[in-house]
UniProtKB/Swiss-Prot annotation:
Homohexamer. HAMAP family: Aminopeptidase_M17. This is Peptidase B. Its main location: cytoplasm. It comes from Escherichia coli (strain K12). Disruption phenotype: A quadruple peptidase disruption (pepA, pepB, pepD and pepN) does not grow in M9 minimal medium, grows better when supplemented with casamino acids. The gene is pepB.
């Protein structure tokens, strides 16, 4: 194996020969990253992406100044879905090293799971991977139930069954209970609900290739909340939390759902399907009904739900929606502590009525008269949260996945959001 390239940190500017804006320089001893105090974590991440671009696949983080956050920033930029990389980590105290190791184990799991081809990651595989990850960190403090196929229809999970029935791979609901108290009557502190569409063709409202080619990542919300629960457990979560993953393919077949179909949910809501490519909200509705039944203090759902959120925020921020200002403020404070990008977008009472249908209580998509697509999608979901004005957060995961590399990230999944949700759960 080639000798590791040493990477050191300096608060001094680079030699003038490297240019006045140089963020790194190279010498006989290795590569030096020149921190300026303005955005040191971002600088380290961008430099790591450049180092990987140079073809350097074996590095040693050396010298003073490295801590868990800086090591993690380097790894976020250095990691990529293709090829192998090796990092020799610096000496850290036990707590910092444990924090880094947990990030590497869990957030890399999130990134790798989202990057997995749809052919190898179907609904059942996604649910089982989630069980395996959380069982690994929680042991016997976790129990779970997997419901699939026709059992979903018989038990009233009509949104999930309707969306997933067009695929040969059965739709799946994972209901997982992390209960560190061991008391079956212990109150549920929080419920996490994730959209797990393992491939989204758009159904009969079919996507163009340019919009379908990244749709293996449409289960990013499910992976994110799974990782968040696992990470919170490693940080000492001592409250009962339930996880609901709504997993399905959205494909075309003779058995696939069609425009004009009407879905009747367990809470009595009837929804007319006018766009089969607005399927995420249809499966999440089932998970939110289950979450509401637990009477938790908070419900957090996460989904790669709308293109409108990406139009507003790009892939740089997750979009946050809530009627609960105090809870939204707590999540944004957690995001600031974890250095993760979240931005709150509007959600008002009138968004709940901007999905009119001539044949049902709700339409599953907005019209040209109501163009705020991310907000109306959140408004749709609110109809399936019993007390939607308090204790509910909706995250439209626009920062989950990048189709092309940028200066801080390789192509593929980012893992952003895991630490923020875990922080909120353990605050």
């Amino acid at each position: 194996m080639t000798e590791a390239m040493k990477i050191t940190l300096s608060t001094q500017p680079a030699d003038a020969r490297w240019g006045e804006k140089a963020t790194y320089s190279i010498n006989n001893d290795g590569i030096t990253l020149h921190l300026n105090g303005a955005d040191d974590l971002g600088l380290i991440q961008r430099a790591a992406r450049k180092i990987d671009g140079l073809g350097i696949k074996h590095v040693q983080l050396s010298g003073e100044g490295w801590d868990a956050d800086r090591c993690w920033a380097f790894w976020q930029g250095y990691k990529a879905p293709k090829g192998t990389r090796k990092v020799v980590w610096p000496d850290l105290d036990d707590a910092q090293r444990q924090e880094l190791d947990n990030r590497l184990m869990i957030i890399d799991w999130v990134r790798d799971t989202i990057n997995a081809p749809a052919e190898e990651l179907g609904p059942s595989q996604l649910a089982q991977r989630a069980v395996d990850l959380i069982s690994n960190v929680a042991g016997d403090r976790v129990t779970y139930r997997i419901t699939k196929g026709e059992d979903l229809r018989e038990q009233g999970y009509m949104g999930l069954h309707t969306v997933g029935r067009g695929s040969e791979r059965s739709p799946v609901l994972l209901a997982l209970d992390y209960n560190p108290t061991g008391d079956k009557e212990a109150p549920v502190y929080a419920c996490l609900v994730g959209k797990g569409i393992t491939f989204d063709s758009g159904g009969y409202s079919i996507k163009q290739t340019a919009f379908m080619d990244s749709m293996k990542s449409d289960m990013g919300g499910a992976a994110t909340v799974t990782g968040a629960l696992a990470f919170a457990i490693t940080r000492g979560l001592n409250k009962r939390v339930k996880l609901f993953l709504c997993c399905a393919d959205n494909l075309i077949s003779g058995n696939a759902f069609k425009l004009g179909d009407i879905i009747t949910y367990r809470n009595g809501k009837k929804v007319e399907v006018m766009n089969t490519d607005a399927e995420g909200r249809l499966v999440l509705a089932d998970g939110l009904i289950d979450a509401s039944a637990q009477k938790p203090e908070m419900i957090i759902d996460a989904a790669t739900l709308t293109g409108a959120a990406k139009t507003a925020l790009g892939n740089d921020y997750h979009a946050l929606f809530s009627f609960d200002d105090a809870l939204a403020g707590r999540l944004l404070a957690s995001a600031a502590q974890e250095n993760e990008p979240f931005w709150r977008l509007p959600l008002a009472e009138f968004h709940r009525s901007q999905l009119p249908s001539n044949f049902a209580e709700l339409n599953n998509t907005g019209s040209a008269a109501y163009p705020a697509g991310a907000s109306t999608a959140a408004g749709f979901l609110s109809h399936f949260v019993e007390n939607y004005q308090q204790g509910w957060l909706h995250i439209d995961c626009s920062a989950t996945y990048r189709k092309a590399p940028v200066e801080q990230w390789s192509a593929g999944a980012t893992g952003l959001g895991v630490r923020t949700i875990a922080n909120l759960l353990t605050a």
